[in-house]
């Protein structure tokens, strides 16, 4: 009798967790599908819902992936304020997760900062873009991750070419 109650309790406890994960997966699948169909408003909404759900579950990697997708879709439609607000929310979420995990999440910080850099590049704000580029450089150095370093070099090259600094862009590509 006690075993039956124990099993029933266990199933009832796990059911909402599995349902939340399924809902999040549905958000991501539907968002990708909407993106492929070029329904950007719906895709943005679904990526935002996935970000919120994943951040509540503490899945920081997938949450930041979904959040940066939503931010990208915001600023592609010139909703810069919303995109910057979302980036601030993601930075706060990363900080909370770093405190909880007692480790630095360089890759996620890099991802959000790079998205912010792309916004400044699209706005043709070279000064703020340079600040973000310097932040990316610091994050890549602190992380000591070759993948981030290569991503940084590629990003630097794009930045330099965008703002007419072709020699520096060529130098960044040579380092790759």
Where would I find each of the regions flagged by the language model?
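A "functional boundary" signal
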Residues: 19-176
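Bacterial N-terminal signal peptides
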Residues: 7-15
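Positively charged n-region of N-terminal signal peptides that target proteins for export
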Residues: 1-5
């Amino acid at each position: 009798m006690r075993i039956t109650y124990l099993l029933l309790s266990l199933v009832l406890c796990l059911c909402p967790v599995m349902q939340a994960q399924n809902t999040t997966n549905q958000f991501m699948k539907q968002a990708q599908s909407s993106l492929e169909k070029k329904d950007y408003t719906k895709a943005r909404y679904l990526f935002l819902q996935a970000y919120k759900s994943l951040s509540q579950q503490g899945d920081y990697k997938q949450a930041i992936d979904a959040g940066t997708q939503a931010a990208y879709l915001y600023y592609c439609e010139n909703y810069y304020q919303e995109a910057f607000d979302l980036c601030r929310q993601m930075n706060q979420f990363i900080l909370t997760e770093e405190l909880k995990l007692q480790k630095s999440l360089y890759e996620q910080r890099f991802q959000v900062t790079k998205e912010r850099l792309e916004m400044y590049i699209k706005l043709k704000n070279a000064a703020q873009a340079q600040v973000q580029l310097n932040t990316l450089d610091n994050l890549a150095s602190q992380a000591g991750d070759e993948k981030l370093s290569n991503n940084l070099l590629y990003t630097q090259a794009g930045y330099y070419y965008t703002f007419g600094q072709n020699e520096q862009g060529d130098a960044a590509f040579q380092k790759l």
